[in-house]
């Protein structure tokens, strides 16, 4: 077979930078899916992307489909011919549809009977004739939430399309994508190199764009250049650049020919909290801040321009001029905000509604304050400090800085609290109350921070469920799933002795008459159980292990975690499979018993050696198991119970549980119930697979 390399490029106006990678990855993925459906082999595929182009190359693409034979089964012989051996209408219709006569059909014999058969030879189609339609389908499936139209065309895409190039080796693939005909024309950089040029071969795409068009279409190469040059530029001024990957990706998606430059701002702005300056530089201007080795912000920033200038200082001065007013605004807001304390802003929180049925933010912070103090008492933290932090937790929402830079809520509260003379624990708690903010974020560990973060989330969860607005489907406007995961993670990772039932009840009590859903507490607890499952699945824990623990519905997160670890360890033991099966058998037997089960085991009614041995083994273990379960040492307890395997196996081999003698039967059921209860102290291991 013959092979060639394929290039497809769609030249557009500037694409959304935050979507560029996803669009490019989806484009090539959709196309390779089409190739596989068409049974066209290839060696590899690589996406390319720049602000004004989506492209990919497919290496060693076969030039035609392979010929193949397709078996087309017809009617069974009994239905294909009548009693006189003449073809029926069914047989003739099938043959006509396949372009043959009934006499030309073969016979297919199987164990189930005999059928007419036609082995049709299907000649493979040239790849070139399939490419256009496959590329169009790949584009149609791109994740574009808001497509747009341009000109007089009815075609829709994420941005207007100007060029389309499809080359199979050196051959132009005729066709049209998004209303634009395929041609060899490739557009270069807007301001450097050739405005456009013709590409002679798919293999020359990247090199021709770089040399003639002054465009680096290799996304990863462009990103690597920016990262390397920015690190070098920061080191040159004695600092370290903050090259957060999300911003690095966005900047990579904004430039075709990256040139890294260093600029400065006045040192006086360093009196403003660094987070505000960084927020402005990164969020508004797409600049990389520079820190010293101690983590202190330096009066420099690194930025990436899309052009090689004969006088870079002009570009540097321009960027310094642009950022200065933004930093001056931050300075003004900070100086203005300092004139009022966080406590003095509490009254203004009365004017802001948190949620119509749940009251104002002032009422919310009063609830958070009381709940944080309650939690503090439960974990031996300072209740007064926790209550104080809860009370001040939302005051920074009324500051100029947070109104302008909303993502700084909490962070600015910390800075203002320090200026107001609050304790460091209170100040830090204001900053950490929203943690964890996203998957993978750290959780607060300082006691006061823990109390406020838990109270803040529990107030929201219980309140929103309490007015009947639980999340439905994918919709979660109050981010309750994130809040619930946050509560669980804070409790788990700090090993806190807290119970969800107690926390929910206290939060519900503090909401008072605001709540109209009388099943709120039950629903919130069930919601937490669902988050337990989601969280542990994300951590790679087997579903059957999670279900085994969920069956016991432990409501203390730290206890839940201990059980998960213990059952996961038990599952790895050699005895686990047999004991899980035995527990399932016991569960089924006990479920069929009518009336109340006996709880006392009579030694006089133990007549078989196997039941005597099992009872004796259980009696030996119980004094060891009781303190282990009391201390939540489930792993050691289950390891001891694993030693019962042989006794349990022998019992089921030698003993008839449902004996005719009622007394013997009830005694054996009591023995099995006792066995199962020991395992149920940890989990329902009958659910292990």
From Swiss-Prot:
It is found in: Cytoplasm. GO terms for cellular component: cytosol. It comes from Shewanella woodyi (strain ATCC 51908 / MS32). Coiled coil: none annotated. The gene is glyS. Pfam families: DALR_1 (PF05746), tRNA_synt_2f (PF02092). It is an enzyme of class 6 (ligase). One of its GO terms (biological process) is arginyl-tRNA aminoacylation. One of its GO terms (molecular function) is arginine-tRNA ligase activity. It comes from the Bacteria. This is Glycine--tRNA ligase beta subunit.
